[in-house]
Amino acid sequence: MPPSFPSLPLPEAVAATAHAALLALAALLLLLRAARALASRCASCLKAPRRRGGPAVVVGDGAGGALAAATAGAWHRAVLASCAYALLSQVAVLSYEVAVAGSRVSARALLLPAVQAVSWAALLALALQARAVGWARFPALVRLWWVVSFALCVVIAYDDSRRLIGQGARAVDYAHMVANFASVPALGFLCLVGVMGSTGLELEFTEDGNGLHEPLLLGRQRREAEEELGCLRVTPYADAGILSLATLSWLSPLLSVGAQRPLELADIPLLAHKDRAKSCYKAMSAHYERQRLEYPGREPSLTWAILKSFWREAAVNGTFAAVNTIVSYVGPYLISYFVDYLSGNIAFPHEGYILASIFFVAKLLETLTARQWYLGVDIMGIHVKSGLTAMVYRKGLRLSNASRQSHTSGEIVNYMAVDVQRVGDYAWYFHDIWMLPLQIILALAILYKNVGIAMVSTLVATVLSIAASVPVAKLQEHYQDKLMASKDERMRKTSECLKNMRILKLQAWEDRYRLQLEEMRNVECRWLRWALYSQAAVTFVFWSSPIFVAVITFGTCILLGGQLTAGGVLSALATFRILQEPLRNFPDLISMMAQTRVSLDRLSHFLQQEELPDDATINVPQSSTDKAVDIKDGAFSWNPYTLTPTLSDIHLSVVRGMRVAVCGVIGSGKSSLLSSILGEIPKLCGHVRISGTAAYVPQTAWIQSGNIEENILFGSQMDRQRYKRVIAACCLKKDLELLQYGDQTVIGDRGINLSGGQKQRVQLARALYQDADIYLLDDPFSAVDAHTGSELFKEYILTALATKTVIYVTHQVEFLPAADLILVLKDGHITQAGKYDDLLQAGTDFNALVSAHKEAIETMDIFEDSDSDTVSSIPNKRLTPSISNIDNLKNKMCENGQPSNTRGIKEKKKKEERKKKRTVQEEERERGKVSSKVYLSYMGEAYKGTLIPLIILAQTMFQVLQIASNWWMAWANPQTEGDAPKTDSVVLLVVYMSLAFGSSLFVFMRSLLVATFGLAAAQKLFIKMLRCVFRAPMSFFDTTPSGRILNRVSVDQSVVDLDIAFRLGGFASTTIQLLGIVAVMSKVTWQVLILIVPMAVACMWMQRYYIASSRELTRILSVQKSPVIHLFSESIAGAATIRGFGQEKRFMKRNLYLLDCFARPLFSSLAAIEWLCLRMELLSTFVFAFCMAILVSFPPGTIEPSMAGLAVTYGLNLNARMSRWILSFCKLENRIISVERIYQYCRLPSEAPLIIENCRPPSSWPQNGNIELIDLKVRYKDDLPLVLHGVSCMFPGGKKIGIVGRTGSGKSTLIQALFRLIEPTGGKIIIDNIDISAIGLHDLRSRLSIIPQDPTLFEGTIRMNLDPLEECTDQEIWEALEKCQLGEVIRSKEEKLDSPVLENGDNWSVGQRQLIALGRALLKQAKILVLDEATASVDTATDNLIQKIIRSEFKDCTVCTIAHRIPTVIDSDLVLVLSDGKIAEFDTPQRLLEDKSSMFIQLVSEYSTRSSCI
């Protein structure tokens, strides 16, 4: 008792002393601050020159800028009101004492209220100052003051209650007691404020300030550069002090920002250097490679590499885990002593208080160590995942062709998304291997004290429980493996469908492929069902094991003649409850070990795959040779084990500065020759020497998602002058003027919203900008029109690359004369090599190629030389419409406001008139609280929510029976060893078994119901999302990267499959368990309710405070996952290009950056969970300590010892259950975001109906194939300009229509409108008198046929690619193959029609893929056929062959041909010339060629003369 207040009760004396001390400390700090400010001002006055006017006063908190405004919210006003309320209550007490006692008032009565009144006046003043100064958080002294005040208030209230009950009304001062009780709510709120620290002020700073309210908006390059330079702050975790680490307060600034506004990625601090992906990758890769070098004949161990890299982290985590395990058994060990104390068996003075203190310290240590342990394993998991992901990515860039063919891109993505995740998650189970034996030893030691030698039976029962769980775990592992295999298959097919959605829609195949995916999902669901039901069995084993162990232990003790006491039984039950966790974890541990081993084996197998050999090509210094490329005795094969190599007897010497052209028929090995120079194709013999750097342009354009400038620069620094020269050389200037944002326009996934010619020219620009020594160009001019091709060849090959070594593959014969050397390939051999004239004289293969080209040119010459009287004599020329018909068509066009033979009007759009709309949309992300509609919708997905009440009922029954079984054991056993038992031992065990096993059955029922509910909801959501995605318009796929969609159907769907339902059930479970714990504790000590209510309020507030940040972190996490997946799939697809440019390091760096962007919110999210749990458990620990203090303060005999022991037993779990309750809701809120994201895709806009039942066309439609365009207007978006401007014309049925025009003139848009991939803004398209907008999309597209520019093959077989709908016989398929000249090739293969087609058709040449696409059209036999640049990638001879097949097989069909090769359309019945989205000309080729000013004749002239011009 303090000497200055001898007459005061102890709690009031302590309160007065504490308030006085805090007042003195505050005064001292204010004086020191004033003195320091005065000294600083004096020093500045002495140093600084005098200025006019007074000193500038900046009010702020020193955050880097002046405070502009501080707005007080409800929180801050509540703080002020609470302080004022506390002050007024003390003033009221003083007034009452003076009024009642008058002059007889004692100093004792006035001392405490007077000191408290002064204290609250000071606190109110400090709270008011917060707004003036601009505090975001209250000072530490103020917060401590509030917490201490609340604690003292509760202690005084308890002391007053005890004295009132024990000694009567005279023992207390009513005025003080009433004021104290009345202050509890206000002080409880201030205590909460003290814990949280926030002032509740909305601060706004000037632009020099910290900008709390504006997110940091940085472009990708700027943000990356700033992060590399360290401009963004590094996480405070990196250099936090011990106290900050222990309390996790280093995270508070981020959570404070999140409580004020939604977090953005820029708000999240950077990871410390040691935590970044680069550091983790270097460490793991170094240890892995060291094993490879030290033990060359043995496969390196990935497990060992991980352990060697992170053993220090594992050791620190193990220390925390060991301390946590030991202190967690202190409570069960002391329960029996505590029950003995309450029974009156006091061993030493103050035993009760000492026991209560030990309980408190143990729980405190348990809380602190648990949070450090869990955060430590989370961080270790992030390190492992980052390092492994980087290793998988690096391997994906270096795979040889054979290895690449054995792993699809979907499988490689799955290695990263699934296997790496699983290995990283094993960090949670890593320490369980040695902790389980430690926990069993500690448990046996406690049981030996309570039940003696019977603890041996406990060990036997524990071993049996573990043994019983092993088969269930193995079964679960089996189901998990099957589930993962089926998921891999579904994801592979989903990825393929998403990448090729355009062809699926054009061919009306989307329903077929969607049904295939649904069938795959059904297989996956079968294994998912068994996996979930096996999880229910594991749950039953989990709850049954401690009951089984308890029955065996107690039964053995009774049989051996031992006596059970209430304290011993409660101690044993508490021990069994702790032992329950490792027993439950053991099956999970076995399962996770098995799953992790499988994942490690898969990853290790992948990392051991063959890479491209470093010696495939030999780099020779330029100073030592004049040869840029030198191949001698070369033999190469994509399949090293085949008897027939792809290329053989290759001898090639290319002198530096030469232009080498490579030509040949399709499948002759042209692209393979370039691959041999790059080192991409396995070398069987010979050598390849390269001198200088290389740039590679593949035949199939590879474009990254990003803007055009980034694609051209490709990691190089911007040189504006060189950049402009590149743009001009690649004929991109006009395209950039027309594109939105110019070269800053973000292009879609794989450049999907660029035309084929634009993609090819962007590729060429990328290569040219690199300023390489050797240029390898694989048919780069096939996708552009004649004029652009001529310009490209002159500006690019002949001018920009005049001094470079160029090897170009081409099918355009007109580009061959400019070559210094021409290589003619056939069947993998160089059959001829030489200059153009020499090869012409030699004849053979080269002569055949040139002859085919000359025939096409001669066809155009015939048209130019003929007149109207000789039209009918043109070879292969179909009968053209009569002159009157043509005139009618002209008149119809004129009536619609368009002349038939006018030049296109150049419409130059000014930059200031462009609407700044990006073509790739940012990923949709909700902000703020998850809507309750999401929860309700999800719960209503399965059986309309009827299972929810049953789940709650089963959980309630489980909790009631659990409490009843423990209460029965505490009540029926004697208090001490000398007392007689209240019931027979057999009855004791039978009743206990009945209650306990009954509770286990109810929890088993609950698990089954949750699994059934979750499975039904997951399946319904998946089907709904899948159908909405497949029904989405093509514009959605044009503007959404496939990786983003894959993220939803893989990651988010997995969360819904395996997590959401159990999170929902877990929240209901913890809620009911928490209510049970509170009920038991309050039954014994009702006073605990005094703290339970404010504690619950504090917990709810902290949960809301936390979830505001956690929710946004989870959303950011989901968004940041997509770029990682997308870069994986994108890089794997373009690995050859990346390697060809020598850009592996840059892409690896990009991958590491994206991994850090993903790890930043993940680290903060995991730390936020521990931050919340720590505070929840600390509150629970203080409540438990308060309960213990009440129990030991009651006189002996007041409370029944067994019931008090039961309350303590449950109280030991209070902190864990309280934190788990809040945490379960928070995790549910975070996981439900996956449901929210799936619902976003369930609300995607849909295309028009596939079938309109009341408006279906006849089965024979279209009979004639007439196509009439009436004032057709098309734009891609409502806010974008028109692409087609009122096009009106008619394509007569059965005629051949050629559609030509410059790049960007609207040719492909017209075709998209015909197939309704884009719905017209205005006008109509009439086919055989039916408006196509009035019928279903499936009815339309299934009656049309198209051979697209980019031939698409699906993984599977030739049969499946030709006839995916399984509508044709084998005979019909063979006939189609023979017609498209592939019959011999397919018959030569062992599998015939079942010959495999790899992902993207990589094992077939581009020309062969195009012929397969022709085979599809032959089988479909549609009346209308569209060729969209269908022959752009084949040689002239093959082009002529295809045209011959089309003329013979589609002679009665309407054929619309878009082509850049003029001979392809020169023999058409009509030619439509488009310019800037309008009809420039539409007439017969002969008439157009007669008009010397026509645009068509210019195109013809350009094509026929460009070879001579070159």
Curated annotation (Swiss-Prot):
Gene3D superfamilies: ABC transporter type 1, transmembrane domain, P-loop containing nucleotide triphosphate hydrolases. It comes from the Eukaryota. Expressed in roots, leaves, stalks, tassels, silks, developing seeds and developing embryos. It is found in: Membrane. It is an enzyme of class 7 (translocase). Residues 889-925 are annotated as: Disordered. It is a multi-pass membrane protein. Residues 906-918 have a biased composition (Basic residues). One of its GO terms (biological process) is transmembrane transport. Signal peptide: none annotated. Residues 320-595, 950-1220 form the ABC transmembrane type-1 domain. Keywords: ATP-binding, Membrane, Nucleotide-binding, Repeat, Translocase, Transmembrane, Transmembrane helix, Transport. Its main location: membrane. PROSITE patterns: ABC_TM1F, ABC_TRANSPORTER_1, ABC_TRANSPORTER_2. Its EC number is 7.-.-.-. The keyword Transmembrane applies. It holds the Pfam family ABC_membrane. The chain crosses the membrane at residues 12-32, 55-75, 78-98, 109-129, 138-158, 177-197, 319-339, 342-362, 373-393, 427-447, 453-473, 540-560, 945-965, 985-1005, 1060-1082, 1086-1108, 1154-1174, 1179-1199. InterPro entries: AAA+_ATPase, ABC1_TM_dom, ABC1_TM_sf, ABC_transporter-like_ATP-bd, ABC_transporter-like_CS, ABC_transporter_C-like, ABCC_6TM_D1, ABCC_6TM_D2. GO terms for cellular component: membrane. ABC transporter that may affect phytic acid transport and compartmentalization. May function directly or indirectly in removing phytic acid from the cytosol or in vesicle trafficking. Required for phytic acid accumulation in developing seeds. Phytic acid is the primary storage form of phosphorus in cereal grains and other plant seeds. Belongs to the ABC transporter superfamily. ABCC family. Conjugate transporter (TC 3.A.1.208) subfamily. This is ABC transporter C family MRP4. The gene is MRP4.
